[in-house]
Amino acid sequence: MAKKCVVVRNEKRKQIVEKYASKREELKKQGDYEALRKLPRDSSPTRLKNRCSITGRAKGVYKKFGLCRHILRKYALEGKIPGMKKASW
């Protein structure tokens, strides 16, 4: 499980990216790279990391569910994810 401060930091970055998204796009279209550079670092979407919404784990995260592989398997076996079941052939 990730530290809470890491998860909180990533959530804060998500909010900053949303806040500056339109302004960043306008500046890119205008080609005003000087003004782009003056925006906060965390306003860049490349600074975001996909993390598990339950544990905060950064690796092995499925974008579609927002869960890491461990939690995804656990929830699938418990039947908490509709339409997902263990494969057998």
Curated annotation (Swiss-Prot):
GO function terms (MF aspect): rRNA binding; structural constituent of ribosome
Entry GO terms, CC: cytoplasm; small ribosomal subunit
Keywords: Ribonucleoprotein, Ribosomal protein, RNA-binding, rRNA-binding
Signal peptide segment: none
A GO biological process held by the record: translation
Subunit structure: Part of the 30S ribosomal subunit. Contacts proteins S3 and S10.
Described function: Binds 16S rRNA, required for the assembly of 30S particles and may also be responsible for determining the conformation of the 16S rRNA at the A site.
Family membership: Belongs to the universal ribosomal protein uS14 family.
Protein name: Small ribosomal subunit protein uS14
Annotated source species: Chloroherpeton thalassium (strain ATCC 35110 / GB-78)
Gene name for this UniProt entry: rpsN
